Design a protein with these regions (language model features):
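Hydrophobic residues in beta-strands and at strand termini
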Residues: 20, 82-84, 89, 160, ...
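Sec-exported extracytoplasmic/periplasmic mature domains
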Residues: 32, 50-54, 74, 85-88, ...
Length: 180
């Protein structure tokens, strides 16, 4: 039998086992703090709108939860992504037994979490460099007023235009943005 093969292992059971020299720091993206091991695991369980096709030459981006590559404005500052309907989260008690579909607002919330001072994310710099309008101000307000981060406050930098459409507005042109 090949190394790692379990005798009597059934095809229905799908388990991925990875060995790391240290435990992961978190499964929560804003709290991984650039932990390579945690990020390796997260890449297996979270899906971004786009993913790399590493086998293509040259390497290219392909839609993952998006239906296509984003529409990019002429000035290179606005990216509009349409999500594929019918993608559901894995069952979780948080969903109270109901199926939960992935929607654009989920990505808005996920990005905003990096700005929430409660998480003190060391990966925030990756978003700060994009200068997403409104997000730094929202963070600053939460810090200055010592109040919880306002997830309900709409900002120009990241918005759900409808159930399946996500718009990201950069504060300055960045041709590498979709490759990050």
């Amino acid at each position: 039998h090949p190394v790692g093969h379990q005798v009597g292992h059934t095809a229905e059971r799908k388990v991925l086992r990875l060995a790391f020299p240290t435990p992961e720091s978190s499964f929560d993206p804003p709290q991984t703090n650039s932990d390579a091991y945690a990020n390796t695991l997260l890449a297996q369980i979270l899906e971004a709108p786009l993913a790399y096709d590493y086998l293509a030459r040259p390497v290219r981006l392909v839609p993952q939860t998006a239906v296509a590559l984003p529409e990019v404005s002429a000035d290179g500052m606005t990216f509009t992504l349409r999500l594929r309907p019918g993608i559901y989260f894995a069952d979780d008690p948080a969903f109270k037994g109901r199926q939960r579909e992935l929607v654009a607002q989920d990505y808005v919330y996920a990005i905003k979490r990096f700005y929430d001072p409660r998480y003190n994310s060391s990966d925030l710099y990756q978003f700060e460099g994009l200068k997403l309008p409104g997000l730094s101000e929202l963070r600053r307000r939460a810090l200055e007023q010592r109040k919880p981060f306002d997830y309900d406050q709409e900002v120009q930098g990241v918005r759900a235009l409808d159930r399946y459409t996500l718009r990201i507005q950069l504060g300055q042109s960045d041709p590498r943005f979709i490759w990050r």
